[in-house]
Amino acid sequence: MEGLSFGPLSILPSLAEELNPHRVAFLTNTTVERLWLEKAAEGIEEPIRIVIPDGEKYKSLETAVAIWKRLQEEGFTRKSLLIGLGGGVVTDIAGFVASTYMRGTLLGLVPTTLLAQVDAAIGGKTGVNFNGKNMIGTFYLPNFVLIAHETLSTLPEEEIRNGLGEVAKYALLDRKVYALARNFEGISETLIRECALFKVEVVEKDLGESGLRRILNLGHTAGHAIEKLSNYRIKHGLAVSMGLMVASKVGEELYGFDSGKTEELLKKLGLPTGHPFRAEEILEEMRLDKKAWYGRITFVIPVEIGDVVVEEVDEAVLKRALEATRDDSGSGDCQKPGGSA
Ligand SMILES: NC(=O)c1ccc[n+]([C@@H]2O[C@H](COP(=O)([O-])OP(=O)(O)OC[C@H]3O[C@@H](n4cnc5c(N)ncnc54)[C@H](O)[C@@H]3O)[C@@H](O)[C@H]2O)c1
């Protein structure tokens, strides 16, 4: 597994030096360049600076081509180090470019959003969008990931909440994360560390995503459908939060799971506990997804905190869970989380 380090940006030069690279290039976007590139590059000799526009739509092959070209012009080699500094969009493209340029260069990731620190930068999945999200990509483990808590100090509240959706997911999957999250008073280094380490542990057991890694889809089956139905107005993390509530209701009916624990947790984190759609609309969206995956879409169901099963669920059960979690009062808005970063 990749070397996961927790510490300030000032340790980046020593992480880079350990790899003895020919050259170092930073890949970042316009927003993170302004906020963090100078600090990250301190102590690294004449790094190449590649800055892409900010936004999911730039997670594209066109952007990858532009980066490959620039690396070639700069004489970047397989023994050079590409450092992706940014949110999940940047870390996904950095991984993709590093895995494909000259069949693979050295790669370091410095995730700067909560979502990227607990999820996107961990586990070796890289990619770009191409007629669909993440349609072109590779599995490529970075040489290091540096989780620098300080970078979250500039992250907007909305992006913190986006990441908290994934934190809530880990809390249902892991008792240690649950214990921290239910007493949430702001994003702590410990909470991020426990989430990140949990993902590392799962991924280490299943890099190719054939088995255990599927548990990381908890909340995502209904969540994706909700995200799509809202035309992506509902952000990923909030849709996942709604999806966790749906999955918990399914768990309650099938395995006696206490969905009140999920509700309490989501409220503590300032996340929505209900979705704004009709059950039939979400089911229809899920059926489309199921078709896209050759009818093999399964559901991750909480049995108790720290324990889930992965199985197909009868539509009637799903429908009841979707009806029980509908909240058309305010399209999933909710109170602020118990503190800030
Ligand atoms: N590879 C994986 O396993 C995996 C897992 C989950 C998500 N993803 C991908 O991650 C992407 C979403 O990641 P994201 O939520 O980080 O989005 P993002 O990268 O678009 O970042 C969100 C916003 O925050 C800004 N930002 C980043 N760091 C900042 C900082 N420190 N201060 C202020 N602003 C900052 C960005 O410029 C952007 O505007 C999606 O493309 C998704 O497919 C990948």
UniProtKB/Swiss-Prot annotation:
It comes from the Archaea. It comes from Thermococcus kodakarensis (strain ATCC BAA-918 / JCM 12380 / KOD1). The keyword Metal-binding applies. This is 3-dehydroquinate synthase. Pfam families: DHQ_synthase (PF01761), DHQS_C (PF24621). The keyword Lyase applies. It is found in: Cytoplasm. The lineage of its organism: Archaea, Methanobacteriati, Methanobacteriota, Thermococci, Thermococcales. GO terms for cellular component: cytoplasm.
